[in-house]
Amino acid sequence: MNIGQRYGWEFALAALLIIEILLFGIANPRMLDINILLLSTSDFICIGIVALPLTMVIVSGGIDISFGSTIGLCAISLGVMNQTGIPMAAAIPLTLLVGAICGIINAALILYTGINPLVITLGTLYLFGGSALLLSGISGATGYEGIGGFPPALTDFANLTLFGLPMPLMLFLLCVLICWLFMHRTHSGRNIFLIGQSSKVARYAAIPVARTLYLLYSLTGIASAIAAIVLVSYFGSARSDLGASFLMPAITAVVLGGANIYGGSGSIIGTALAILLIGYLQQGLQMAGVPSQVSSALAGALLIIAVVGRSISLHHHQIRDWIQRWRNQRLSS
């Protein structure tokens, strides 16, 4: 298989991304400013940080829709720890631990109950979200009021640049590299595809299914914690609703990036390109004066188109055979 066949979908996404930027640039020349393009990634790049390990979860045949609440819980946990005087050098690793525990809870419930991951993570979505609100109330911040008072070392992070790139974008690129190397260049990563194709066969082949799922859901929790830390730095406060709007664009990016929603196939590079495609779509529409409700509707339509288009591309041989049989029947009649 040559590189064009292997990465054809990724090349198509890259071409669509360039076309999208050029079209929005015609409507608003500011969209072609490289500085605006780079700085605007901070508005949506945290979705990509979570979508990368979510890709691996979906490839394994699972799903996690609780990451939005995990982000809120991790953000509030960081705020409470800051309020109690715990230094950031300790609070940040503890926040990552909170995210990992959330992922472990998801994996444990899925493995030991045998219930569909969608149902389990729907339950933990409310569990983690309620816990975030409870912690927020204990800290004295009622409802969705934020917890502030973070040190400048944290709040300045999201505004820093490295080699001309915003730090959140650099962090995202680092996550892309790590996830790509793990998923496509390690034995454990290749096991993810086998588990997604058939977990029963994977168990018969002595693949550590349970250990792999614990790892994947933990990585999603840790990524949610990283996103929470970046969001707290970006907004300067911790709120329980910071990840509330991440669910639809993250899943859309994973599916648009080439992942089979039923498991067995997917691409980290595809997800990364899809995040940029969706993010710049929303940015371009906002700069064009399109209401946010319309951009949300377009994101939903994009998810449907991605699922249908990917399904057609995966089953084009069967579709072609069906069309040929239908034509033969018409001719014979």
Curated annotation (Swiss-Prot):
The chain crosses the membrane at residues 7-27, 45-65, 70-90, 91-111, 118-138, 162-182, 212-232, 240-260, 261-281, 288-308. It comes from the Bacteria. InterPro entries: ABC_transp_permease (IPR001851). It is found in: Cell inner membrane. One of its GO terms (molecular function) is transmembrane transporter activity. It is a multi-pass membrane protein. Keywords: Cell inner membrane, Cell membrane, Membrane, Transmembrane, Transmembrane helix, Transport. One of its GO terms (cellular component) is plasma membrane. Its main location: membrane. Belongs to the binding-protein-dependent transport system permease family. AraH/RbsC subfamily. Part of the ABC transporter complex LsrABCD involved in autoinducer 2 (AI-2) import. Probably responsible for the translocation of the substrate across the membrane. The complex is composed of two ATP-binding proteins (LsrA), two transmembrane proteins (LsrC and LsrD) and a solute-binding protein (LsrB). This is Autoinducer 2 import system permease protein LsrD. The gene is lsrD.
